[in-house]
């Protein structure tokens, strides 16, 4: 028995060593405080960051199956593995992004102009304004949170001609905001992060921070950067609630 056991142990050890390493689940991607794009892996509340090798990002978004990154010279399109699959020349400055229901790139906004992805090209939409957040609203329309003076309005417009289809004042919304794929508006109210759906129903989670910006981190996730270059948070949006987690960052 001893001889058989001794002979068996090295075989077991070899079998264990031969097993492939288990990779943590992918959550999405964020840009860190230095502008480098980091893949976010792990589980809620226990995130690990991995450098994608992409730097100088001024805006970034990820849907779970595709990514969009704006640098001061280009707009980059990424696949699910964070590999660049297309690039477009672009002026300096930040951008807003939106994806379709399948997670494919749909819209981009920068320098006062709205663009749509169509047939592998980036085409301008006949609309201009001070957009705060954008989303696709059906196959032929876009939803935009527009700043008008000290008010924010939610506008739905035609992608074909740029005509406004309907609009409404976003009562109680004044700061940075985001739009989810279902049209819900995300904003800060006092100490809470709020998700308000089309019926006016709200989900809240305590945050206690001033927000610089929201960006899409992954499917069902938003990145939230605290004002003044502060901490980075991940907001998980569930049908019945919200969860907020701090994301560890690599020291610059």
Language-model regions, residue ranges each:
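Repeated scaffold domains used in trafficking and secretory/extracellular systems
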Residues: 19-20, 55-65, 90-103, 128-140, ...
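Short beta-strand elements that form the blades of beta-propeller/WD-repeat-like
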Residues: 25-32, 64-71, 103-109, 140-147, ...
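Short loop/turn segments that connect beta-strands within beta-propeller blades
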Residues: 42-45, 79-83, 118-121, 157-161, ...
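An edge-strand/N-cap motif at the start of beta-rich repeat modules
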Residues: 19-46
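A short beta-strand motif characteristic of beta-propeller blades
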Residues: 46-56, 83-89, 121-127, 163-170, ...
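Blade-level signature of beta-propeller repeat domains, shared across WD40, Kelch, NHL, RCC1
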Residues: 225-252
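Bacterial N-terminal signal peptides
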Residues: 6-15
